[in-house]
Amino acid sequence: MLRLVSDENFNGDIVRGLILRRPGLDLIRLQDIGLEGLDDPAVLAWAAANDRILLTHDRATMPDFAYSRVTAGQSMPGVFVVNDRIPVRQAIDVLLLLDICSEQAEWAGLVLYLPL
C-alpha cells in the first residue's frame, strides 16, 4: 500500500473518490493537517520527512523542485503528476491501480506523469 499526500490544489473530487473506493487508503490532504500555503520545496520536504508520495496537478514547477531534491541527494519519495484534464474516474482508477500493483519504494526519486 502506498502512503500518499495530496497538495492543496489537488482535485477534491479525486480525493473523495479514492477514499470512497478504498476506505483504508493511506492518503492525507495537506489542508487537513494545517499545511496549506506552503511553497513547493516545503511541500516536498514535508512529504519526504513523512515518507509520502505527493499527488499534484502542478506540472509547471513541482517536478523541477522534486528533481532538485534528488540531485542534491535529498530524500524524495516520489511525485505523481496527475493531468487535471482527464476524467475524475480515470484519475481514480489509475491511482488505485498504482496502489494495488506497486510498492512505496518503487517510486523513490521518480516523478510519474499520469495517465501513462
Model-flagged regions — what are they?
Residues 40, 48, 52-65:
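Acidic, metal-binding active-site segment of PIN/NYN-like and related structure-specific nucleases
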Residues 28-30, 55-56:
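Short, conserved beta-strand edge motifs with alternating hydrophobic and charged residues
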Residues 2-25, 31-35, 41-44, 66-116:
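Acidic, PIN/NYN-like endoribonuclease modules and their adjacent C-terminal/linker elements
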